[in-house]
Amino acid sequence: MRIAFLGTPDFAVTCLAELVASGHEIVCVYSQPPAPRGRGQDLKPSPVHAFAEGLGLPVRTPVSMKTPEEIAAFQALDLDAAVVVAFGQILVKDVLEAPKHGCFNLHASLLPRWRGAAPIQRAIMAGDAVTGVQVMRMSEGLDEGPILMSQQVAIADDDTAASLHDKLAAVGARLLPVALAAIEREVVQETPQAEDGVTYAKKIKSAEARIDWTRPAAEIDRHIRGLSPFPGAWFEAPSEKGPVRVKALLSRVEAASGVAGTTLDDALLIACGEGSIRLLKAQREGKGVQDAQTFTRGFPIATGTVLA
């Protein structure tokens, strides 16, 4: 089939690679415009953009898919289908209806739970035991379309957003070609989403990522894992030059107790509202990710220090 692929992050790269390998004609790849990245904040293409260019595929990076010019350009592609994976833009009706078979989205949750931008992070933070990937027909509503195919994925007790991301990307990449084959043969069954159990995975903002040490340790551990590596759960530690922001990237729940937010030893054991958290990996501003021993060697935090 003649397919357009719309995606931006690493999660979508895995899916695009599988579609290319499955033999479909990728007519055009759409991705978000180049954005400032890294310490120098130089403009760099998205992972999908860079991957597609490496394969010699045509790439478009519109600021908006809603302009008359972009809509007309998309319609002119004469597509059989469009596949959308974490693209990052809303598609209007004229775009959704342009391909012969329609536009299809791979979503990283079991809808209607966790509609929206951050389903992987939200599932871990909420303590869900199971998530999954689903292929759905896109509608004008946010992740509201009927489901074509679905596969569950268990969330392990030590999963981070990064590890669960990789699991879901691999499963989703295998599911997409199967779904497209059924779409091409017009034998796919579409199931409307349930009206009950709708939740929204809104984007994680910095203020929400801050650790609240008054919460139980198990909840804080999920918070840390769900936001690792990005955007990173964080707290502030005192220093001679003022508060220093520290990202907590890997942790372990322990039984020791004390005043919430207080360090119980000099090796990053921190009291919570219930139990305690042992930080295993951390990152302070301007530094790389370090294990606890390396971190405390360069930035000692004494027993009894109060963290904010």
Swiss-Prot record:
SUPFAM superfamilies the UniProt entry points to: FMT C-terminal domain-like, Formyltransferase
UniProt-recorded name of the protein: Methionyl-tRNA formyltransferase
Protein task: Attaches a formyl group to the free amino group of methionyl-tRNA(fMet). The formyl group appears to play a dual role in the initiator identity of N-formylmethionyl-tRNA by promoting its recognition by IF2 and preventing the misappropriation of this tRNA by the elongation apparatus.
Reaction catalysis annotation: L-methionyl-tRNA(fMet) + (6R)-10-formyltetrahydrofolate = N-formyl-L-methionyl-tRNA(fMet) + (6S)-5,6,7,8-tetrahydrofolate + H(+)
Entry similarity comment: Belongs to the Fmt family.
Top EC category: transferase
Assigned keywords, A-Z: Protein biosynthesis, Transferase
Chain sites annotated for binding (6S)-5,6,7,8-tetrahydrofolate: S109, L110, L111, P112
GO CC term, one of those recorded: cytosol
EC number(s) reported in the record: 2.1.2.9
PANTHER family: METHIONYL-TRNA FORMYLTRANSFERASE, METHIONYL-TRNA FORMYLTRANSFERASE, MITOCHONDRIAL
GO molecular function terms listed in the Swiss-Prot or TrEMBL record: methionyl-tRNA formyltransferase activity
Domain of life, per lineage: Bacteria
